[in-house]
């Protein structure tokens, strides 16, 4: 095998990847667009008995920190809107990214409350509680590190329920604390719940998966338990009423999309029921319900949970709850993407530019792989040296394929040549390439990350297609500099057009990925020349002009 055939192997692997991508798209098609009727109804009559009545109309209050802009409905205390000021909606946009939304076209809310026999959110006890608040807007002031938003409700029996949102500067984790004061003569049986509900179908203005070459990251529900660290739950499964219903001590429930996530993390000593539900009107939900606790007469009970609402920043998510960082969707190559990202982030802490970090990590990867690359070129050189003997063997043995195969293997053994030695480095490079692809499309740190000049977003395609063209040029030079034993006219034609074909494919790839491939090709050219000089000294390579 020589460098020309290497390109054929790469092309085969690449085409296989594209076919797999298309199959994934066909296997998990996006639901047909449909209008979602605005509603605040939550799961009713589900397997977990997680019934909550319609919210009705409450007052909307604004809660702002340096990183969160929330809108909370005083009817039930649900978070109906979440804006992320640190993350623009689009490149060069002044509008913040909206994670939670309540509109006629799209529903995505973080709901929570107190159910159980005596809970104010129990449908049997009437409408959801209408909380009282001191003001309509809460803002984290300069020099202030914590913002508390207390909401109180007193039922007909005189029992007081206080729901307090606690937000901290620079933090996407919101603590939701409940305080129950029993003013009656009987114990109160209370359970807490947290629920995330979302329209299954994305409206056109939110659906960004328009490119057939884009990597479609997971969008749906997920959960974690001590037994199952991370499990995805598809919206389609919920829509088919195949719902989750398990008990867990600890863990979390979440809804995921590219770069961003919401999650409820309950904090209690008992068990929680994790569930999903099809709420109708094209809305799916995932949530938890805690084990009931008793609040004795004249006593006060407390329940706590945490809501994560923001970007998938792995180290911060891991600090909030075990395994919450696994929500970053690195696909089936996560075991390569995760350490690759950690190394990339470490490099970025020194250079301050993600593009230069990609360049440096490319040099590191190719440096580590240099012994394999050298072995690859040495193996190919030995194979070329054996070609006259192999050709003479074929002429001598004619059509006796069995004897040809036997004598070729004996020749390889005698000359200490591995006929597959040229393939192994390629089989390693391809997973690294794909892992980098997953990393670019799954790491929020690389979303809208600029490099230099015209590249303002390494996770998006090059707007002027300059990088893909440069990549094609580097492939052309590698091809021209590589000796070949390809004699078949059809293979020669394919090899001639290979740089052009790859250039076309790479037009739609993230510019960070194309940058990696360009630098990798440039390193290949340098390593190739160094290796050829060593092979010349051993008589395994000559500098004669390559035949076209």
UniProtKB/Swiss-Prot annotation:
Residues 24-342, 447-463, 510-512 are periplasmic. GO terms for biological process: protein folding; protein insertion into membrane; protein insertion into membrane from inner side; protein transport by the Sec complex; protein-containing complex assembly. The chain crosses the membrane at residues 6-23, 343-370, 417-446, 464-481, 494-509, 513-535. Keywords: Cell inner membrane, Cell membrane, Chaperone, Membrane, Protein transport, Translocation, Transmembrane, Transmembrane helix, Transport. Residues 215-265 are annotated as: Interaction with SecF. One of its GO terms (molecular function) is membrane insertase activity. InterPro entries: Membr_insert_YidC, Membr_insert_YidC_N, YidC/ALB3/OXA1/COX18, YidC/Oxa/ALB_C, YidC_ALB_C, YidC_periplasmic_sf. Inner membrane protein required for the insertion and/or proper folding and/or complex formation of integral inner membrane proteins. Involved in integration of membrane proteins that insert dependently and independently of the Sec translocase complex, as well as at least 2 lipoproteins. Its own insertion requires SRP and is Sec translocase-dependent. Essential for the integration of Sec-dependent subunit a of the F(0)ATP synthase, FtsQ and SecE proteins and for Sec-independent subunit c of the F(0)ATP synthase, M13 phage procoat and the N-terminus of leader peptidase Lep. Belongs to the OXA1/ALB3/YidC family. Type 1 subfamily. This is Membrane protein insertase YidC. It comes from Escherichia coli (strain K12).
